[in-house]
Amino acid sequence: MSTMNPDYDYLFKLLLIGDSGVGKSCLLLRFADDTYTESYISTIGVDFKIRTIELDGKTIKLQIWDTAGQERFRTITSSYYRGAHGIIVVYDVTDQESFNNVKQWLQEIDRYASENVNKLLVGNKSDLTTKKVVDFTTAKEYADQLGIPFLETSAKNATNVEQAFMTMAAEIKNRMGPITAASDSKPSVKINSSTPVSANKGGCC
């Protein structure tokens, strides 16, 4: 139980990035509000929603940011990435170009986000099976090469949407375990003066 803030144990900032039209806003609406609309209008600016979840007995507040159309103008700046704990890169399984552009989005992350930020690759619109052009295996192999989790989702019928955000939250929580975001309660791993770090242990950044 946190003494600093009774409402949550962790606060994670998540970003949704990817080409315009891949369904980022729809994923956000589905996860945060459990709603879906075909006619979601892209707004200019940055929008975010908050949802609190329970994970491993901890209360985690997710602050999820959506680019809200900025990617069309390539105006996403470093300030958008600053402080992000996790970034979800979204492509459209019916749009090969959006998948091809994942590499560019990952380069943006490398350029602007913190070095150890968690990443998740999401192929959205999996309900459009007859229009699908990006094979699951192809995307999975790519994600495996990068060492990041991968899921196919459908904001329309809610397939894997919950799982995508929960996967991301779990990945961040595992990484941040020792340094609880909103609580100074028990660090699970602590290196102190009685635990010398030898050179042959290898890096663990």
From Swiss-Prot:
Its main location: Golgi. The keyword Glycosyltransferase does not apply. A motif (Effector region) lies at residues 40-48. A lipid is attached at C204, C205 (S-geranylgeranyl cysteine). GTP binds at residues 18-26, 36-43, 66-70, 124-127, 154-156. It comes from the Eukaryota. Transmembrane segments: none annotated. One of its GO terms (molecular function) is GTPase activity. SMART domains: ARF (SM00177), RAB (SM00175), RAN (SM00176), RAS (SM00173), RHO (SM00174). Residues 183-198 have a biased composition (Polar residues). InterPro entries: P-loop_NTPase (IPR027417), Rab (IPR050227), Small_GTP-bd (IPR005225), Small_GTPase (IPR001806). It is found in: Golgi apparatus; Endoplasmic reticulum. GO terms for biological process: protein transport; vesicle-mediated transport. Probably required for transit of protein from the ER through Golgi compartment. Belongs to the small GTPase superfamily. Rab family. This is Ras-related protein Rab-1A.
